[in-house]
Amino acid sequence: MKSKRVEKPWGHEEWLALNDKYCYKRIYINAGTRTSFQYHNFKQETNYIISGTAEVWLENDNNVIEKSIMNAGDYFDVSPPKKHRVIAITDVILQEVSTPHVDDVIRLQDDAERTDGRIESEHINPAICILAAGFGKRLENLTENINKALLPVEDKAIISHIIDLTPASFDIVVALGYSANLVKGYLKIAHPDRNFTFVDVDKIDGHGSGPGYSLRSCREHLQRPFYFITADCIVDNLPSLDTNWLGVFRTGIPELYSTVDFDEQNNIVQFSNKSSDGFEHAFIGLAAIKEYKIFWSELDKNIKSSGEVVSAFYNIKAYKDFKVQKLNWTDTGTIDNYIKIRNNKHSLAKTTGECLYRIKNKCPSCGQNTDSKCIKVFPKEISNKIKRIDYLKSFIPHVTTKDNHTLSYNWIAGDTLYAIDNVSLYKKFVEWSYNNLWKPVECKNFNELHDNFYRKKTEQRIKQYMECKILRKHVEINSVNNKYCGSIQDLLDNIDWNMLSRIPTNLFHGDLQFDNIIYNNDNDGFTMIDWRDDFGGSPDFGDVYYDLAKLYGSFLINYREMRNNNNASISIWDGNVSLNLIDHSPGLVELRDSHWFDKWIESHNFDLHTIKILTSIIFLNMSPLHELPFKDYLFYRGKEMLHDCYR
């Protein structure tokens, strides 16, 4: 059988094995609670105390109830029809092995007044409800194209951090609204072993919307003990769902949070919502709801007055007990907090919403982590990217799963060329590309594709950059590194778009830079990742010169180092922009300073002037897609380079 969790008034059981010969459980009993006083007609069991201290009642052969204090390492046998009970002095974990008569229980006295036998409601899987419907407005431009639950932290989506803490037996209910299809597609690929229920929330903005409304939308799926958590909440651990509790974190600004006061036993005694007279610990958006019927009743009574989920806790005395759990909390819901902690090692942050994740695979039989897989999510539909797999399949990873916005493949062994930073290997890859890619083909409408991709796209991207008024603190400056370059429009007017060299090919990558090339030393092979969808709207054709220009740009800027915001920046003084670039890759710097690639280009009869123009256009096109300060660096580096091409 698959392991399951069974809820109990005093804690819970984890059923690890049940067959026609035996049942194996772990039993968790909360301090201060007790099991039923009960007996069995057929079931025989042995209990071993793994941890904790308990008072064990056990009927002897003379029908006398003996009471013994037992600790970790002690055990006791129960034969039918001996009466017995366990009272937890501390939190107790028992290991029970029994005959398979799991429903054979006669309750003589039970604090929850349960009847004999199996209690069906205890056997419904508990759940966690992840509230991921909102726009994530506090994250500003980072969530313009993607749900905040999918933002990566340490190369893993925030929502995956939550799911990985959730016991395997729990159902997962996800409240969705903004960018719902992206979240669904990601979760199905990243966590195929989990049981998801997706709830579409019909109101995600304006009066009455919010976590409370989203949670109520999931109500029919939460008629059982459950956690709820906001999709921007990361914690180090998820305490057991054996009692009601709220996750809290110390704060000095109670007017911004719902805050709680509690006694020495962590019992909540008072609740305050966003008041300067509040308390020292803030509710973090994570709660365990054991008494779910009371919770829904209290939420219904109070939510109309405040519209907030915390209104269910205003009358804390309505619950049998309600505790706090002091947790190590990371709030990823604001742009400053998120940027501070994201620490993604395998991708350069973009404002497009495209995200890369590294997910541990799990063995379906043993549940242990095995190898890793790469998942990429794209807000824009990727049918062309998928179509291009047929052209590039000899050179790219084997794609294992894909849909309209997501694709996945096993993590490629090796490292990127930037990470290796070996002069000979850079050169070797350039020769490999020349020998394996860029085979010329005939394309009748290539002039149209060329114009769409270079001129029209550049005009759109420049407009997009100029409209980023919130991010750009200055108007365009026309002097770069003490050279007067003129306006960007003046520079673009210099380009004769029809005269740019071009060679149509099927075998192009489209983002051919060294952070997208994996080298495996064991098989001495290159693998290309993150290939482009199309060229000017066509997935079938590309331009050899575009790949060459991408490579040229990757010699000039180490994109891997741009993950650190301090490595590329601009400084403005007296009407001049100075470009600042830090590069810690001596191999790349050696090739750049020796102009090796310039010489290679000319020795292979390619037009170096065209490649430099296209590289400057590439930098300009990249600028609106990245965050500050790299955004501004790319724009002004492109301006300077384009100026140098025509001076």
Model-derived features: where do they sit?
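N-terminal glycine-rich phosphate-binding loop and ensuing alpha1 helix
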Residues: I124-V183
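Conserved beta-loop-beta/alpha segment of the NTase-like Rossmann-fold superfamily
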Residues: K188-F262
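Conserved core of the sugar-phosphate nucleotidyltransferase
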Residues: I234-G307
